[in-house]
Amino acid sequence: MAGRAGSDERYVLDLCDEVFGIPAVRQERFDWLRGDPSPTRPRGTTLPVDGYWPDLGVVVEFQEEQHSTPVPFFDRRQTVSGVGRGEQRRRYDARKRVLVPEHGLRLVVIEKSAFTVSSRRIVRDRTRDIAVVRGCLETD
C-alpha cells in the first residue's frame, strides 16, 4: 500500500484542488459528525472527511473499493459498535450523506471506479483524470 503522500486519495484530492484553484483542508473533522459511542468516548469520535473547501462549502469523499466491495480480512473485525468494520463503514458513509448536506455543505463522492485502475491503483493520466474529477465536481 502506498503511503498517504502517494495514495490514490491524495492524487484525487490534489486534482480537486487544481479544479477549484484552492487547496482543501485534508482530514477535517466536525463536532457534528461523529462515530458510534464507545465506553471511552461516549459521544463518539469525530469522523474525518477526506477534503473540505470551507470557502466553497464543499466536502469531497474519495471512496475506494472497501466502500462498495467487501474486504473479508478487515470487514469481519468487530468494532465498538458491535458490528463488523464493513458494516460500520457503510453506516458512517450513510451518516456523512445525511449530515454533511444538513449542515449546509455540498457533499461530492468520487468513486475510485470512475478512474482507470490497474493492480488496485489509479493509472495516472492527468488529462483524463482531471476530466473525471471535473465531471464529478460539476454534477454532484
PLM region spans:
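Nucleic-acid endo/exonuclease domains
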Residues: M1-D140
